[in-house]
Amino acid sequence: MLETWVEKIKTNDPKQVASLYHTDGLLLGTFSDIERKGYDLILEYFENLLKAKVDVEIVTEHKYETESLIANSGLYNFIVDGKTVNARFSFVFIKTDGDWKILSHHSSVLPESH
């Protein structure tokens, strides 16, 4: 599931990325101080972010999976217009009507001293 999210980010298409989120999904994004719940606010976040050329590299991931839930946390790097931003993430994916959707996504810039 995380790989699908990365692939959609690389398309630079906000609607493709936002479509991965549950209708009641929550996004605490790396580049925003706003809590975004629901499709419209999540779409708005990615419309703003993807105005730039964005790439994502997974550094580490730790996944727990059941038949209907995946929790995935770790580190990734955003490359935004050639500048690297080191960040940490937590995703919760839920299976809804046979499709996996992002229920919760928290991402924040990695502190400089860790």
Predicted segment positions?
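Short, mixed charged/polar active-site loops
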Residues: 34-35, 84-86
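Short hydrophobic/aromatic-rich beta-strand segments that constitute the beta-sheet cores
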Residues: 27-28, 72, 102
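Short, well-ordered alpha-helical segments enriched in acidic and aromatic residues
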Residues: 11-24
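Short beta-strand edge/turn micro-motifs at domain boundaries
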Residues: 86-113
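A mature extracytoplasmic/lumenal domain signature
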Residues: 31, 62, 75-76, 91, ...
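Surface-exposed, charged secondary-structure patches
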Residues: 43-81
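A short gly/proline-enriched turn/hairpin at secondary-structure junctions
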Residues: 26-35, 47-52
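Amphipathic alpha-helical repeat scaffolds
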Residues: 2-7
